Amino acid sequence: KDGKVNPVILAAAATAGVTKIFKTGGAQAVAALAYGTQSIPAVDKIVGPGNIYVATAKRKVFGKVGIDMIAGPSEILVLADGSCNPAWVAADLLSQAEHDRLASPVLVTDSAALAKAVQAELEVQIPQLPRAAIARASVDDNGKIILCTDLHKAIEACNIIAPEHLEVCVEDPFGVLNEIKNAGSIFLGRNVPEALGDYFAGPNHTLPTSGTARFSSPLGVDDFVKKSSFIYYTRDALEAVAPRIADFAEREGLHAHARSVTIRYEK
């Protein structure tokens, strides 16, 4: 805001071995990195979260450059049973609600008593937040409490929603872990608030949102590695399979494909 880069960010970048830093942001930064300017070179890939304008800009430039995902708005789903502390659950829901009016805080539980207690706790805690207006809008517009008949039905609901952050706040989190199929990041147990994953635990917190955890993964080292396939056959090895290759190609009507193999063995 004052025209300077936060020194903590600069220190982290130096520790990570970053050699170039450009002081820019927003959709315009995405455009500059994708197409290049006089002062910013074009890049091959753009990663990381942002607001709705950044997400839309990344969608626009995809194809010109690679991207990791279209991320946001932020989501948290707390799967909780009746043994949970409702104040903790409410605090965890609000940790994402304060991000953005469009953020989605969701509680899925098999306990009606917990559902009521968490609802009451939200009303206590929201006014205490510096970003209370944002948290209030998020909870009112996008917040949900889903009451299920049992824990297994609750897990089914989680898998359908496929949340960005999933807190498994139940008595035996490892006992139900194998049932969980779709989530960006899974926080196991009552002592693992979402903020632990954001700031300290280690896994990247750029995560799939809007149900895309059904088919995509968090940002990770693979996003920064480009792979190629390698194929080598000897003459004898190719000759042994040449008729089968030609047969596949001819069945597709691609006779030049077949010819490129069989010509090597014509006398």
Feature locations, PLM:
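Conserved NAD(P)+-binding/catalytic subdomain of aldehyde/semialdehyde dehydrogenases
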Residues: 15-104
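Glycine-rich, charged/polar anion/phosphate-binding loops
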Residues: 60-65, 89-94, 132, 151-153, ...
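Structural motif
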Residues: 19-22, 43-47, 51-52, 68, ...
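Active-site-proximal loop->helix
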Residues: 2-16
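A conserved active-site cap/scaffold subdomain adjacent to cofactor or substrate pockets
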Residues: 69-141, 145
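Glycine-rich, Lys/Arg-enriched anion-binding loops that position phosphate/diphosphate groups
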Residues: 126-167, 171-172
